[in-house]
Amino acid sequence: MFNSLVQLNISPTARVGVIGIGGLGHLALKFARAWGCHVTAFTSSESKEKEALELGANETINSRDPEDIKAVAGRFDLLLSTVNVQLDWNTYLEALKPRGRLHMLGVVPESLDLSVVPMLFGQRSVGSSPVGSPATIRNMLEFSSRHNINPVTEHFPMDKVNDAMEHLRQGKAK
C-alpha cells in the first residue's frame, strides 16, 4: 500500500478509496489517512464499518450495493483494491475521477472484466504494484514509526489451530 502511494505520486489532498478492509485493507486505510488523504472504505460488512472508521476511514460505502457505489461516481483519485474476489470493476472505474486509477493489491484469481469506454473517455487506468524495493520498505517502516502505524493482528494458541484455519477460510482473518 505504501509503495502504491509513492509510485503513483499520490498527493495528500487526494481522495482514496480502499476496497476491502481485511489484512491488506486495514493497513491501506492507515497509510492513506496518515499520508493526508481523504479515505473511504468500501466494505461488504456492516460490522466492519465502525472498525474502518476507527482505522482511519473518513467514511464508508456498502460495497454490496451497486447504487451506493454509483452514487460516488467521479469522486476518487485512487481506488486500492485489496480483495481477492471478482467484483463489478466497471462500476468502480466509474467511481474514479478523470485520470483516476484502480490499483490492484489483492490477487483476483479470474481475469478482470473491464470495459475500455470508461477508461478511454475518463483517461482512467488500472494497474498494480509489488511491495517495493528494500529502500521503499525502509521508508515505509520509517513512515510507520513516525505515524504510529501498526498492523492489527490476531493470535490463536496451537490447540486452536483448526479454529484459526476456519477463521481464515471465512475471510475473518486480520
Task: Identify the role of each PLM range.
Residues 1-35:
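Short internal alpha-helix immediately C-terminal to a glycine-rich phosphate-binding loop
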Residues 100-101:
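Glycine-centered, small-residue-biased loops immediately flanking beta-strands
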Residues 9-10, 95-97:
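A generic alpha-to-beta junction signature in SAM-dependent methyltransferases
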Residues 106-123, 134-142:
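Rossmann-fold NAD(P)-binding glycine/threonine-rich loop
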Residues 18-21, 33-91:
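Adenosine-nucleotide cofactor-binding segment
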Residues 134-174:
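C-terminal hydrophobic helical "lid"/dimerization subdomain
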Residues 90-95, 115-116:
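A short acidic, amphipathic alpha-helical/loop segment
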Residues 22, 45, 108, 132:
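Residues in the short beta-alpha loop(s) of Rossmann-like NAD(P)-binding domains
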